[in-house]
């Protein structure tokens, strides 16, 4: 029953002009009884997800690693607390990962991301991270950092993003 939908947020990897056209046409075809339809990229979803976590998880840099087909895509969020409002910076990188589930290659990537950096937390998303192949790389990531594994971070971030649009709060300032 589409009458019960108050708002809808869709998140996707890249939100370019073409994707926006496709999503707008698709949601228009749903004939929803709401004008609260929004779209955001995975980068924005990662930002909103972090905002709604305890501050100690994003006090320093926060890293997300997304396991893809033959690569690991990473997002690194850092907040400048010396500005008002606080400014968040996001850096996106992609690392080739030609050998599936290589602990050695993952540790190499982890070191590139974390060495000489203050990292509060690391999020590992993608089904492959749930399997039991990361021994040394996971041990490295867990030293002085909180590490989380799951697959719903972008969808939760989309929900938080919509909440912030509907009722802006202190969290988003």
Mark where each language-model region is:
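Conserved phosphate-binding loops in N-terminal lobes of ATP-dependent enzymes
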Residues: 1-15, 93-108, 112-119
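Nucleotide/phosphate-binding catalytic cleft detector across ATP-hydrolyzing
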Residues: 1-62, 83-84, 143-144
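Glycine-rich beta-strand-to-loop/alpha-helix junction loops that act as flexible
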Residues: 11-13, 121-130, 158
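A short acidic (Asp/Glu
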Residues: 18-24, 49-52, 74-77, 130-137
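A short acidic Gly-Thr/Ser loop motif
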Residues: 56-73, 78-80, 126-129, 171-173
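Short glycine-rich, Thr/Ser-proximal phosphate-binding strand/loop in the N-terminal lobe
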Residues: 74-104
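Repeat-based blade/solenoid architectures
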Residues: 152-157
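Acidic, glycine/GT-rich loop-and beta-edge segments that sit at the periphery of enzyme/chaperone cores
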Residues: 160-173
């Amino acid at each position: 029953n589409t009458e019960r939908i108050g708002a809808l947020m869709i998140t996707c990897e890249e939100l370019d002009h073409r994707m926006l056209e496709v999503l707008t046409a698709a949601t228009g075809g749903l004939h929803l009884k709401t004008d609260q339809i929004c779209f955001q990229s995975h980068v924005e979803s990662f930002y909103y997800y972090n905002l709604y976590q305890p501050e100690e998880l994003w006090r320093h840099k926060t890293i997300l690693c997304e396991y893809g087909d033959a690569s690991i895509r990473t997002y690194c969020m850092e907040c400048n607390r010396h500005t008002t409002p606080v400014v968040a910076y996001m850096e996106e990188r992609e690392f080739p990962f030609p050998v599936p589930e290589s602990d050695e290659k993952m540790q190499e990537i982890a070191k590139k991301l974390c060495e000489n950096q203050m990292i509060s937390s690391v999020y590992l998303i993608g089904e492959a991270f749930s399997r039991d192949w990361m021994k040394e790389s996971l041990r490295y990531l867990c030293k002085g950092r909180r590490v989380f594994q799951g697959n719903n971070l972008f969808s939760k971030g989309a929900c938080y993003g919509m909440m912030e649009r509907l009722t802006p709060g202190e969290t988003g300032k």
